[in-house]
């Protein structure tokens, strides 16, 4: 007896979800003006404008100019799934021992696959290699999933360390060296 169409569709989507979980996410340093990096930032800005109750205007946000996102001043990373950009993140030098993580974003189609966590871990590794001992980041109150991930990854909420107009939560993490992890 053949499965009903609804059951067959559910089974297909379940298999599709399982297969998509096994694809490899690659996170690599990129230049901030590459086509993939620009696409990710455009999607990031679009999503923030849709999700924030006040909207989002990048001109009003604290800047992260391209020249601050290339070594040794910073890093721009792009996450790719099957060769297609699905996420990004930025590490920006604040001072010789402190870095700031910005522009953490994952495409909705790639969420729940560990993309953001892999981007965050890559940025933390780059921070350690750059000699940073502390990382800062901030986020908006509507991004509850980001707040949960940061807390799970050892970031603690601290007092505001900048005047980012869209931020409601500021986080900090003290990094351990690779040898003591």
Model regions and ranges:
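Short coil/turn segments at alpha/beta junctions that flank glycine-rich nucleotide-binding fingerprints
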Residues: 97, 113, 129-133
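Acetyl-CoA-dependent GNAT
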Residues: 22-102, 107, 120-121, 126, ...
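Conserved GNAT acetyl-CoA-binding A-motif
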Residues: 120, 126-139
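Loop/helix-junction capping segments adjacent to catalytic residues or to phosphate/diphosphate-binding pockets
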Residues: 35, 113, 144
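C-terminal "cap" of GNAT-fold acetyltransferases
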Residues: 9-14, 18-21, 32, 40, ...
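Conserved acetyl-CoA-binding loop-helix of GNAT-fold acetyltransferases
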Residues: 106, 112-125, 148-152
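Conserved phosphate-binding and hydrolysis motifs of nucleotide-dependent enzymes
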Residues: 83, 87, 114-116, 131, ...
């Amino acid at each position: 007896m053949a499965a009903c169409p609804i059951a067959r569709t559910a089974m297909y989507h379940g298999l599709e979800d399982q297969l998509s979980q096994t694809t490899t996410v690659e996170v690599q340093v990129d230049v901030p003006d590459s086509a993939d990096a620009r696409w990710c930032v455009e999607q990031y800005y679009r999503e923030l404008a849709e999700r924030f109750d006040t909207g989002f205007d990048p001109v009003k946000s604290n800047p992260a100019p391209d020249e601050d996102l290339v070594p040794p001043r910073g890093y721009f990373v792009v996450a790719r799934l099957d060769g297609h950009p699905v996420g990004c993140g930025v590490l920006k030098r604040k001072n010789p021992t402190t870095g700031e993580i910005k522009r953490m974003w994952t495409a909705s189609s790639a969420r729940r696959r560990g993309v953001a966590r892999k981007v965050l871990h890559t940025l933390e590794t780059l921070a350690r290699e750059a000699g940073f001992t502390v990382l800062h980041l901030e986020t908006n109150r509507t991004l509850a999933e980001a707040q949960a991930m940061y807390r799970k990854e050892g970031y603690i909420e601290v007092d505001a360390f900048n005047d980012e107009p869209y931020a409601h939560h500021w986080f900090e993490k003290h990094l351990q060296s690779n040898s003591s992890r």
